[in-house]
Amino acid sequence: MSAIHEWGVAETARQLASKQVSSTEVTQALIQRCEAYQGMGAFVHFAPELALQSAKEADVRLGAGERAALLGVPLAHKDVFVTKTMPTTAGSRMLAGYQSPFNATVVQRLMDAGAISLGKLNCDEFAMGS
C-alpha cells in the first residue's frame, strides 16, 4: 500500500469507510507532511489544531456508523474561498486581515460532506493566473 500522503480523495474516503485507518491517523500524517515542507510557502493559513479536532469528531461519527461522501477526509483549498474559521486574503495585501462571516458555497458543501480543512493554500493575487 502507498503512503497516506500519496492517496487521493477517493482512496482516503475508501480507507476511512472500511476502517483501515482513522481520520486522526490520516490527518496527523498529512500534518507531518505539510510541516516537513512548510518552507515552500504552500499554506497561507495552516490550521493543524482545528484539523485534528475535526478528525477526532469525524472518527466518532464514523464509529457510530455515519456515512458521508468525504467524512474524515482532510484537504486544503485555495485562499480565494472565504471561510468563517480562517482569514481570507486571496493573495492580496488589500484583503489582509479579512474575516468572512460565512463560508463560500464550495467550502460549505465540502464541510457538509464531512471534509476536514487543513488550511488555505497560497495563490497569486485573486487567483488570476497572471
Tell where the protein language model's regions lie, with residue ranges:
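Short glycine/serine-rich loop/turn segments
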Residues: 37, 71-130
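Immediate post-signal peptide segment of exported/extracytoplasmic ligand-binding proteins
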Residues: 58-74
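Alpha-helix boundary/capping residues
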Residues: 16, 34, 58, 113-114
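Short, basic phosphate-binding NTP loop
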Residues: 54-60, 129
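Short clusters of hydrophobic/aromatic residues that line enzyme substrate/ligand-binding pockets
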Residues: 4, 40-43, 58, 94-95, ...
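An N-terminal boundary/leader segment
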Residues: 1-46, 50-53
